[in-house]
Amino acid sequence: MEQPRYDEAKWPILLVTMPPEELAGPDLLLHMDRMSAFSKRGVQFVQVIDVRAASSLSAKARRLVAERMDQDEEVYPHILVGVAIVLATPMHRGIFKAITWLSRNPRPFEAFSEIDEAVIWARGLLRAQHSLTLPIAPDVTKRVG
């Protein structure tokens, strides 16, 4: 069975291309472990997941993915900044919505039809997140106060 491809060339944007066959059982668990490993690094990042050629996930698989994302958020808070999904069909959009509804932790989720659009969104999200977490320089606070 073909496995997902993980492309870190644009890190901290992670591009994941899902295979045509549905991931299930040990293959799905391996994929989720690999995705969790990116959070373990402790560096904020955005996932861009290309599912245009992928088959749909079962309801059980959708629940497992959402649960793992929630677990990762609890252990590594605010590391996964957002998720962009590149979709080709309305069926994929429905699966994507189901995963976002199943997740307990709010994070930006956005659907796109092209990878380039998703990467632009991911860059903007990281830029905005970075500007929110930058410390205020001491000389600026002196001038304001």
Locations of regions flagged by a protein language model:
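Amphipathic, Lys/Arg-enriched alpha-helical "gate/interface" segment within cytosolic domains
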Residues: 1-145
